[in-house]
Amino acid sequence: MPDTGAIARICGIGPAKQVADYAVGKGVTYVNHTFTTHLALCASIQPFAGLKDHKICEYPVRPQPMAWEMCKTHIAPNAQGEVTVPEAPGLGIEIDLGAVKKYLIDAEIKVGGKVLYKTPSLA
């Protein structure tokens, strides 16, 4: 179960699509994996959204409040329990920057006095 929400695990949507295509070529069912935000859920379903006859999707039935409030729009299963990929641009859902700001922690990483990373502004 590749976790496309965690870049360190599979390196994003492109590599996950390669894994999904490889799995299909070997007769193996590819299943997404995420229990975090709906943003991560949207990213995790992209690699297999267009695969023929794909019917399995891991869905966080009881997301944590923080995970739910990070996005203004959400993906919900229909009456048949199926999840469809949003058709809006990008990942298809809208991020709630106000909610994200509540959890933002300023961080700065320096090596030898040189700033390598600083928390970006969410203006």
Residue map of PLM features:
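Shared catalytic-loop signature of beta/alpha-barrel
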Residues: M1-G90, E94
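Extended hydrophobic packing segments that form well-structured cores
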Residues: L91-A123
